Amino acid sequence: MESETEPEPVTLLVKSPNQRHRDLELSGDRGWSVGHLKAHLSRVYPERPRPEDQRLIYSGKLLLDHQCLRDLLPKQEKRHVLHLVCNVKSPSKMPEINAKVAESTEEPAGSNRGQYPEDSSSDGLRQREVLRNLSSPGWENISRPEAAQQAFQGLGPGFSGYTPYGWLQLSWFQQIYARQYYMQYLAATAASGAFVPPPSAQEIPVVSAPAPAPIHNQFPAENQPANQNAAPQVVVNPGANQNLRMNAQGGPIVEEDDEINRDWLDWTYSAATFSVFLSILYFYSSLSRFLMVMGATVVMYLHHVGWFPFRPRPVQNFPNDGPPPDVVNQDPNNNLQEGTDPETEDPNHLPPDRDVLDGEQTSPSFMSTAWLVFKTFFASLLPEGPPAIAN
């Protein structure tokens, strides 16, 4: 006789997926089969599930009844975790739900036989009546997972107890189906031309309020005749900023204090640049060239600052004549009847001031052009001084 195999105890921890019950820890043998373990769970598990309703999962794999635990559970571990999924049926609530389902299925079946002879349509209406006639306690029970599965099992063979969708998802699918069916119906009726739009709200005619009568002489200043011969008024703003320069891009440029008052960093940068220029000039040229360039640079700097102006600026003498007297009530047509000045009619006659300006605009000489080039070259080497402030 073959010797009996020694029992190999193993500890199993059974967990519920919906966490309705606490984890059950039990002791078993590695020689058990999965069917034997299900039969043991039907006796010790709180809800007493039947073996055919149980589903055991280990490491993500569904265990079959003929498999042995010795082949599934590794020997290195003494404790193994199993997940139990089962369809639990409550015997206390099942008679009430079955009675409600039976009553609801009999009533719509008798009333709809004459109207709807087809079986498919009657089945659909029967199922919808079942869901509609459930009372409030029934809805409270269906809100729980196990009660929802019981309700689906009681509806008929068309519904599965292990549906992957929840109760809210199924109702949402039903709403989407009804909306899609309604849109198809509207599209079909609109294409056939028999679509009647729903009665809209009663349109109330809008009565515009009459415009008020204009007030006589509301703006007396505008109704007065303007003086055509009045001199234009010059508005002088005494508080305007006088330190403004015109910008080529448009708009004035306000003089800032940073351009007038330089700080020590600007003076240090200027001194460093000038020292680099002197070092290059001293080491890469002779002493005579160095002194000549330095003298010319100093003279150009003094001229640039304004100490040695080579040519005084022309002073324009404007005649200090008062403004012409305003002629009151002058006829604008009198300007056409007055005699013109013979000096203005003669194109060869020019005023003395214009002769002087034309004499100054003669072509520059070669020396003035050379001096301008020399001055511009050395002036570009010198830093730009602060701009003059207008008085």
Swiss-Prot record:
<dbReference type="InterPro" id="IPR039751">
    <property type="entry name" value="HERPUD1/2"/>
</dbReference>
<dbReference type="GO" id="GO:0032469">
    <property type="term" value="P:endoplasmic reticulum calcium ion homeostasis"/>
</dbReference>
<dbReference type="GO" id="GO:0044322">
    <property type="term" value="C:endoplasmic reticulum quality control compartment"/>
</dbReference>
<dbReference type="GO" id="GO:1904294">
    <property type="term" value="P:positive regulation of ERAD pathway"/>
</dbReference>
<dbReference type="GO" id="GO:0000836">
    <property type="term" value="C:Hrd1p ubiquitin ligase complex"/>
</dbReference>
<feature type="topological domain" description="Cytoplasmic">
    <location>
        <begin position="311"/>
        <end position="391"/>
    </location>
</feature>
<dbReference type="GO" id="GO:0036503">
    <property type="term" value="P:ERAD pathway"/>
</dbReference>
<dbReference type="GO" id="GO:2000060">
    <property type="term" value="P:positive regulation of ubiquitin-dependent protein catabolic process"/>
</dbReference>
<dbReference type="GO" id="GO:2001243">
    <property type="term" value="P:negative regulation of intrinsic apoptotic signaling pathway"/>
</dbReference>
<dbReference type="GO" id="GO:0006986">
    <property type="term" value="P:response to unfolded protein"/>
</dbReference>
<dbReference type="GO" id="GO:0031396">
    <property type="term" value="P:regulation of protein ubiquitination"/>
</dbReference>
<dbReference type="InterPro" id="IPR000626">
    <property type="entry name" value="Ubiquitin-like_dom"/>
</dbReference>
<feature type="domain" description="Ubiquitin-like">
    <location>
        <begin position="10"/>
        <end position="72"/>
    </location>
</feature>
<feature type="compositionally biased region" description="Basic and acidic residues">
    <location>
        <begin position="346"/>
        <end position="357"/>
    </location>
</feature>
<dbReference type="GO" id="GO:0034976">
    <property type="term" value="P:response to endoplasmic reticulum stress"/>
</dbReference>
<dbReference type="GO" id="GO:0005789">
    <property type="term" value="C:endoplasmic reticulum membrane"/>
</dbReference>
<keyword id="KW-1133">Transmembrane helix</keyword>
<feature type="region of interest" description="Interaction with SYVN1">
    <location>
        <begin position="170"/>
        <end position="190"/>
    </location>
</feature>
<dbReference type="GO" id="GO:1904292">
    <property type="term" value="P:regulation of ERAD pathway"/>
</dbReference>
<dbReference type="GO" id="GO:0016020">
    <property type="term" value="C:membrane"/>
</dbReference>
<feature type="modified residue" description="N-acetylmethionine">
    <location>
        <position position="1"/>
    </location>
</feature>
<protein>
    <recommendedName>
        <fullName>Homocysteine-responsive endoplasmic reticulum-resident ubiquitin-like domain member 1 protein</fullName>
    </recommendedName>
</protein>
<dbReference type="InterPro" id="IPR029071">
    <property type="entry name" value="Ubiquitin-like_domsf"/>
</dbReference>
<feature type="transmembrane region" description="Helical">
    <location>
        <begin position="290"/>
        <end position="310"/>
    </location>
</feature>
<comment type="function">
    <text>Component of the endoplasmic reticulum quality control (ERQC) system also called ER-associated degradation (ERAD) involved in ubiquitin-dependent degradation of misfolded endoplasmic reticulum proteins. Could enhance presenilin-mediated amyloid-beta protein 40 generation. Binds to ubiquilins and this interaction is required for efficient degradation of CD3D via the ERAD pathway.</text>
</comment>
<keyword id="KW-0597">Phosphoprotein</keyword>
<feature type="region of interest" description="Disordered">
    <location>
        <begin position="100"/>
        <end position="126"/>
    </location>
</feature>
<dbReference type="GO" id="GO:0044325">
    <property type="term" value="F:transmembrane transporter binding"/>
</dbReference>
<keyword id="KW-0812">Transmembrane</keyword>
<dbReference type="Pfam" id="PF00240">
    <property type="entry name" value="ubiquitin"/>
</dbReference>
<keyword id="KW-0256">Endoplasmic reticulum</keyword>
<keyword id="KW-0472">Membrane</keyword>
<feature type="modified residue" description="Phosphoserine">
    <location>
        <position position="135"/>
    </location>
</feature>
<dbReference type="GO" id="GO:1902236">
    <property type="term" value="P:negative regulation of endoplasmic reticulum stress-induced intrinsic apoptotic signaling pathway"/>
</dbReference>
<dbReference type="GO" id="GO:0030970">
    <property type="term" value="P:retrograde protein transport, ER to cytosol"/>
</dbReference>
<dbReference type="GO" id="GO:1990037">
    <property type="term" value="C:Lewy body core"/>
</dbReference>
<keyword id="KW-0007">Acetylation</keyword>
<dbReference type="GO" id="GO:0005783">
    <property type="term" value="C:endoplasmic reticulum"/>
</dbReference>
<dbReference type="GO" id="GO:0045047">
    <property type="term" value="P:protein targeting to ER"/>
</dbReference>
<feature type="region of interest" description="Interaction with UBQLN1">
    <location>
        <begin position="115"/>
        <end position="200"/>
    </location>
</feature>
<keyword id="KW-0834">Unfolded protein response</keyword>
<feature type="topological domain" description="Cytoplasmic">
    <location>
        <begin position="1"/>
        <end position="263"/>
    </location>
</feature>
